[in-house]
Amino acid sequence: MNFSGKYQVQSQENFEPFMKAMGLPEDLIQKGKDIKGVSEIVHEGKKVKLTITYGSKVIHNEFTLGEECELETMTGEKVKAVVKMEGDNKMVTTFKGIKSVTEFNGDTITNTMTLGDIVYKRVSKRI
């Protein structure tokens, strides 16, 4: 399955508590909670380029599925991680105690991130 395309956030749950737990400052949490971010994915074989735009903040990540890479987090921190496929429609990674599962289903992406007992869920639609 190829996931290439542009997707815009439609809804999110537990944004504020999750971002607080990640250490994001309160002013940035308040600015970011209502922004409908856009993710652009270029998926070619095992290579993935991901550009996420939240207002003026842009995060670029490139990785090869199944290989260690450096990812930039929402806080701007760079972390080492391995992004793996589960089945043919889920990308899964773990970094700094956070498990991230990104599920592709037609024109919808559901990203679920878990940190301790806080679960942040973001649903995006293809635009």
UniProtKB/Swiss-Prot annotation:
The modification Phosphoserine is found at S11, S39, S56, S100. The modification Deamidated asparagine is found at N105. The modification N6-succinyllysine is found at K31, K36, K46, K57, K78, K84, K90, K121. Plays a role in lipoprotein-mediated cholesterol uptake in hepatocytes. Binds cholesterol. Binds free fatty acids and their coenzyme A derivatives, bilirubin, and some other small molecules in the cytoplasm. May be involved in intracellular lipid transport. Deamidation and transpeptidation at the beta carboxyl of Asn-105 forms an isoaspartyl residue found in an isoform of the DE-III fraction. This rearrangement gives rise to an extra negative charge carried by the acid form. It comes from Rattus norvegicus (Rat). InterPro entries: Calycin, Fatty_acid-bd, ILBP. The lineage of its organism: Eukaryota, Metazoa, Chordata, Craniata, Vertebrata. Transmembrane segments: none annotated. (9Z)-octadecenoate 2 binds at S39, R122. It is found in: Cytoplasm. There is a cross-link at N105-G106 (Isoaspartyl glycine isopeptide (Asn-Gly)). Pfam families: Lipocalin_7. Keywords: Acetylation, Cytoplasm, Isopeptide bond, Lipid-binding, Phosphoprotein, Transport. Belongs to the calycin superfamily. Fatty-acid binding protein (FABP) family. GO terms for biological process: cellular detoxification; cellular response to hydrogen peroxide; cellular response to hypoxia; fatty acid transport; intestinal absorption; long-chain fatty acid transport; positive regulation of fatty acid beta-oxidation; response to vitamin B3. (9Z)-octadecenoate 1 binds at K31, Y54, G55, S56. The modification N6-acetyllysine is found at K84. There are three fractions of Z-protein: DE-I, DE-II and DE-III. DE-I is virtually lipid free, DE-II binds palmitic, stearic, oleic, linoleic and arachidonic acids and DE-III binds mainly arachidonic acid. This is Fatty acid-binding protein, liver. GO terms for molecular function: antioxidant activity; bile acid binding; chromatin binding; fatty acid binding; heterocyclic compound binding; long-chain fatty acid transmembrane transporter activity; lysophospholipid:sodium symporter activity; oleic acid binding. The gene is Fabp1. Forms a beta-barrel structure that accommodates hydrophobic ligands in its interior. GO terms for cellular component: apical cortex; cytoplasm; cytosol; nucleus; peroxisomal matrix; protein-containing complex. The modification Phosphothreonine is found at T51. The modification N-acetylmethionine is found at M1.
